[in-house]
Amino acid sequence: MMSSKGNEVHGMRKIILRIAGSAVMAAAILCGAQVSCAQRVGPDTIALFPKNIGEFAYANLKQARAEKWFPQLQEQMLPERFKQFEKFLASAGVDPNSQVEELAWGLIAEGVTAKTEGTGSTAVPTGEEIVGVALGNYNPNSTEAYFKAQKLPSFKSHGFTMYAFGTGTGPSDLFFLFLDSNTAAFGHRSELEQMLDVRYGGAEGLLRNERMYSLINEANGSGVVWAVLNPAYTRLAMQQLAPQVQQFPEAAKLVTRMQNLILNIQASSGIDGKFQAICGSVDDANTLAQLMTLAFAYQQYQAKQQNPDLANLLGQATVNPAGDRVVLRLALTDDQMTTLIKKNTFALKM
């Protein structure tokens, strides 16, 4: 019978695999990009987002599309709602592949409160809404004229017209509007309206969320792809990836004390995917690092038979505690990426 310690490691290995998958999927689109090309998201863009964002992410799609095998990964890694957004724009004559250059989006959790979303709680999101901006070059007048001619459902807010992806009445329907010729916003209606409230000073924005904004500033500009998660989304990630971990009191307590997750990708002649788990203490970080190291070794052993290329990748991963953080790094070559993509290694549902 497996000991509780062994079960903890078994549960943690699933977390590590998902972490590895997340980092690799993001890293995969960046081979050939240069570190010097990594762009910072301007504070004016970050300032558009509501204060209660639980997850904030960024991708430089212009650089990603320069990679020859990006189309193969696009179906696996891009958010489903962004795919809907691309199709929606294409119907109006907008070419997302040439006109949409950067994407930033945020998730707003349902099922948690301002009190329960922080550390020390077991509450996790039970649903979510999305709001995002696509930065690029647009012709708002011609696009909006097309939407009007098609008689798409629309709503006015703060002088802007929001166009519905679907009927405009469903709870999951997404909307779209142009903020200017370089910025298109998309998301659920309530969140878009909140974004406009923030824009015009009627509500507090993400700049007022000191913890998230501090970590966003840390991640911003350090990679072509990066993301920051708050405590509630951190717990949800752990719960979804390794439900067994909640069965063990000490491991479960460690999860409730976790503060944030940060992912960023740097690229030069190769790829360096960096994932940081911010723990509740130095001791927690040391414990988590030990479990992650064991989990990688175990998964590497399991993968040798079915996917030796993945096993090699896991063998190259490094896990180290750094104060109250655990830092995971994954380094990949072009050849490794090509082989792993062919084997559909990155087909993970995020």
Predicted regions and their residues:
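Bacterial N-terminal signal peptides
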Residues: A20-G32
